[in-house]
Swiss-Prot record:
This is Putative glutathione-dependent formaldehyde-activating enzyme. Zn(2+) 1 binds at C27, C29, C95, C98. The lineage of its organism: Eukaryota, Fungi, Dikarya, Ascomycota, Pezizomycotina. Binds 2 Zn(2+) ions per subunit. It comes from the Eukaryota. It comes from Aspergillus terreus (strain NIH 2624 / FGSC A1156). The keyword Amino-acid biosynthesis does not apply.
Length: 191
């Protein structure tokens, strides 16, 4: 039996709308839902195998994208949010009642500071950018996945057109490297 990657992948990837303007994300509580409003589509939406991201029950991967911080606002029941791990680089704000991570924010100096991490599957609106790649794929082994079955996982991602990486996609890794080079004076700030 095939392991569950993520419902947005296992059930077939639905192409997003490049003109999509955003929408609301809701926690899983039956009432008094935490609501987060996004004023734009996400970018770099991807399957993530890290151990920190929120995943649907039984899924090996999360699907997470980013939006500019100024395009995210908590619009209902924000008092239910708490930071899951205050020592983590990405401060994941989760609902105290249902446990769903509503958004992750970086508050320290980091290449992705200013971008908030979100799970668009928490929206009831269609049009969000579809997953673009799978990152931190080998990390599922650290969570107990059988390493002998990794080729099956990678093959399933490739079958739906997603490249797999054991970090992030090359453009995102280039962004991190360029940030570090600028910070260390090795690259002009204008580049």
């Amino acid at each position: 039996m095939n392991p569950i990657l993520h419902p947005l992948i296992d059930n077939g990837i639905t192409p997003g709308d490049p003109n999509f303007a955003g929408g609301n994300l809701y926690c899983k509580c039956p009432q008094n839902k935490v609501t987060v409003t996004l004023k734009s589509n996400v970018a770099h939406n991807h399957a993530c195998g890290c151990s920190k991201c929120w995943k649907p029950t039984g899924a090996l991967f999360s699907v997470v994208g980013v939006v500019p911080r100024e395009n995210l606002s908590v619009t209902a029941n924000g008092d239910k949010l708490h930071v899951v791990d205050k020592n983590a680089v990405i401060q994941r704000n989760a609902c105290r009642q249902c446990g769903v991570h509503m958004f992750g924010r970086i508050e320290t100096e980091h290449p992705f500071k200013g971008l908030d991490f979100v799970h668009v599957e928490l929206s009831d609106t269609r049009g969000w950018q579809e997953p673009q790649f799978a990152g931190f794929v080998s990390s599922i082994i650290e969570q107990g996945f059988d390493p002998s079955k990794m080729e099956t996982v990678r093959s399933r991602f490739k079958a739906v057109g997603l490249e797999t990486y054991d970090s992030l996609s090359p453009p995102l890794m280039d962004t991190i490297a360029a940030y570090t080079a600028r910070k260390n004076g090795k690259l002009s700030a204008r580049l």
